[in-house]
Each structure stands twice: as structure tokens, then as C-alpha cells.
């Protein structure tokens, strides 16, 4: 797994590339949690370049959500992979995570809309 990190409009944007599974979660967690504790607590996890996620990967998304909530930071997820969206919907994470279809939309809406969830974005997964 490769992890790209950039700063844009006051947010750290973390983009994992490849698979987020039991083997790669430790590196992903290490990078994200280090950023979360460093300078600011506002993150966008751009998951558009993920090709696979397992239960360990989903668990890491929940853990990161909880950590950012604890410090009252902002967190958004960018996901366009229908398989990953379906997994989030099956475990009802779409009800608590702020998921956006692209980075532009996330940057536009995060921090402005509070508990924003784009329900239309998930509507075709039924």
C-alpha cells in the first residue's frame, strides 16, 4: 500500500492506494493518527484509490472517526467505489460517516454542513 498525504484548504487529505486490509491497516492507522495528533484535527480520507477493504480496514475507519470526534475535529470520507459503499451501508456506517462522491464536494461541504450525509449518494445501493 502507498499512502499519499497533502494539505489543502486547511485539511490534511490522506489517500491510501491499493488494499486496506489486515496487512496494511497498521501503516494506515499510524499515518492518519499521527496527522490527527499533529497541528490540526481536520482530515479528509480520500478512499477513491482503494481497490479492496476488509473488516480490519472498516474497523480502522471507525477508529479514526472516534478519535477525530474526541478532539472535536472535522472528518470526511471520499468514496466512489460502489463495493466499498455497499459494505458501509450494510453495517450502517453511512448513517454516521460523512461520505462524499469526490474531493471537490468534500472540500466544499465539510465544516459547513455539520452532520452531512448525502443520502442520494447511497440511494442506488439498495
Name every feature range the model reports, one short phrase each.
Residues 104-126:
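A charged, well-structured terminal subsegment
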Residues 20-97:
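Amphipathic alpha-helical interaction surfaces in cytosolic regulatory modules
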Residues 8-10, 48, 104:
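Conserved catalytic submotifs in the C-terminal HATPase_c
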Residues 10, 75, 79, 111-113:
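Long, contiguous secondary-structure blocks with strong helical propensity
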Residues 25, 103-104:
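Residues at or immediately preceding the N-termini of alpha-helices
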Residues 1-15:
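Short beta-strand/loop segment at the start of cytosolic alpha/beta domains
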Amino acid at each position: 500500500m502507498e499512502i499519499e498525504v497533502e494539505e489543502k484548504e486547511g485539511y490534511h487529505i490522506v489517500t491510501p492506494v491499493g488494499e486496506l486490509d489486515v496487512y496494511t491497516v497498521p501503516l494506515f492507522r499510524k499515518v492518519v493518527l499521527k496527522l490527527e495528533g499533529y497541528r490540526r484535527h481536520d482530515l479528509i480520507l480520500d478512499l477513491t484509490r482503494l481497490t479492496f477493504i476488509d473488516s480490519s480496514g472498516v474497523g480502522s475507519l471507525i477508529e479514526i472517526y472516534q478519535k477525530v470526534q474526541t478532539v472535536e475535529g472535522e472528518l470526511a470520507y471520499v468514496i466512489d467505489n460502489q463495493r466499498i459503499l455497499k459494505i458501509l451501508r450494510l453495517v450502517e456506517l453511512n448513517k454516521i460517516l460523512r461520505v462524499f462522491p469526490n474531493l471537490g464536494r468534500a472540500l466544499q461541504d465539510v465544516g459547513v454542513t455539520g452532520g452531512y450525509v448525502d443520502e442520494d449518494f447511497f440511494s442506488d445501493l439498495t
